[in-house]
Amino acid sequence: MDMNELARRVKEASIVLASAGTELKNRALAQIARSLQDGREEIIRANREDLLRSEKENLPGPLLKRLKFDEAKIQEVIEGIHSLIELEDPVGRTLLSTELDDGLELYKVTCPIGVIGVIFESRPDALVQISTLCLKSGNGVLLKGGSEARETNRVLAAIIAGATHKAGLPPDWIALLETRSDVGEMLKMDKYIDLIIPRGSNEFVRYIMDNSRIPVLGHADGICHLYVDEDADIQMAVKIAVDAKTQYVAVCNAVETLLVHEKIAPAFLPELKKAMDARQVELIGCPRTRAVIPAAPATEEDWRTEYLDLKLSVKVVAGLDEAIGHINTYGSGHTDGIITRSGEKAARFMDYVDSGNVFWNCSTRFSDGFRYGFGAEVGISTSKVHARGPVGLDGLVIYKYRLIGNGHIVGDYAGRLKTFKHRKMNKDYGIVTK
């Protein structure tokens, strides 16, 4: 089918989906979970084909690991769907209600964005997570997965479309794109697609951001920092730094640079070195760091590097303000934390660091939609427009203003026959239809 026609159908179906009630959407999600359960053998067979072909094509080990979609992964996404059903519907919430004048009421009410274009690499579980989040939030979705997962993605998209159709929704709300050229076309389709969400490597996300006509929600880099203040608990700081770096290194919320106050450096750095050596972490330090512990020499480029590996840059700083300046200069606006006993310093850090997630005395690895209680996430945004940080259901809705009157005209107010009252109401939007 022509791609424009495919996108047009998704757009049309998204309008129907946007008006679907919570009960219908949850029924469709439950049907998806049942259909995934029933289709386990077909899914695993398709995934085995993808794995065998990708091994022959010498796909790197980390990508092969992400590509694998076995019994455990299927069960995981099914459990995720059941958790999603339990979450509050983000659509139809009244954010503001104002009586402009007698009988003239204004409501600001959440609504779906429209059609989401999602471009992702390797992970078939991302297809299920993102499409079900789009369904719950009332959005149509155009999906472009990596060619390495094409058989698995075909089966999953067909199962999801069939399940939602069975539940009473139009199947065209979801569509799968398969060819590489589809990505370029997709990025030009601002007539049909309202938001692009890329999931993949830094280079991949940067390419999408640089070549899209459509707003992009995501992040290209995850250069996360921890700052160890002069009055930090040393054992706490070591424990947090180890977790933030090594709990899972190949993720965007792993710490890449550690900033250390000069007064605590002589006591803290040897303890850090001992703990990181035990986990095979290579330390890369500034001259002041290397005066205290052995470390590879850091260059200017190291402060801008997302390693996604067992490497950690370390810099000794004069104090809190230098740490904040460093983070705002070299950071990516993702997640940054401070370790200190001082509430005053923590507050200053959280106010002045220009990032979507700012933490006090805890690991950067907590920056995650599931850990925040969002159920799941479509990604993490470092943007300051619309959504920021881990993006769950709330990040997939926008709002519309609904004004209800009874023959009101602007001429009466322009001519001063009437004046506005602008009274705040504690009232949810609703129209009696019977």
UniProtKB/Swiss-Prot annotation:
Catalytic activities: L-glutamate 5-semialdehyde + phosphate + NADP(+) = L-glutamyl 5-phosphate + NADPH + H(+)
Location of this chain's protein in the cell: Cytoplasm
GO-annotated cellular components: cytoplasm
Main location: cytoplasm
InterPro entries attached to this UniProt entry: Ald_DH/histidinol_DH (IPR016161), Ald_DH_C (IPR016163), Ald_DH_N (IPR016162), Aldehyde_DH_dom (IPR015590), G-glutamylP_reductase_CS (IPR020593), Glu-5-SA_DH (IPR012134), GPR_dom (IPR000965)
GO terms, biological process: L-proline biosynthetic process
Protein origin, superkingdom: Bacteria
EC number(s) given by UniProt: 1.2.1.41
Pathway field: Amino-acid biosynthesis; L-proline biosynthesis; L-glutamate 5-semialdehyde from L-glutamate: step 2/2
Any one GO MF annotation of this record: NADP binding
Keywords from the UniProt entry: Amino-acid biosynthesis, Cytoplasm, NADP, Oxidoreductase, Proline biosynthesis
Assigned protein family: Belongs to the gamma-glutamyl phosphate reductase family.
The protein's role, per its UniProt record: Catalyzes the NADPH-dependent reduction of L-glutamate 5-phosphate into L-glutamate 5-semialdehyde and phosphate. The product spontaneously undergoes cyclization to form 1-pyrroline-5-carboxylate.
Protein name (record): Gamma-glutamyl phosphate reductase
Organism per entry: Pelotomaculum thermopropionicum (strain DSM 13744 / JCM 10971 / SI)
Gene transcribed to yield this protein: proA
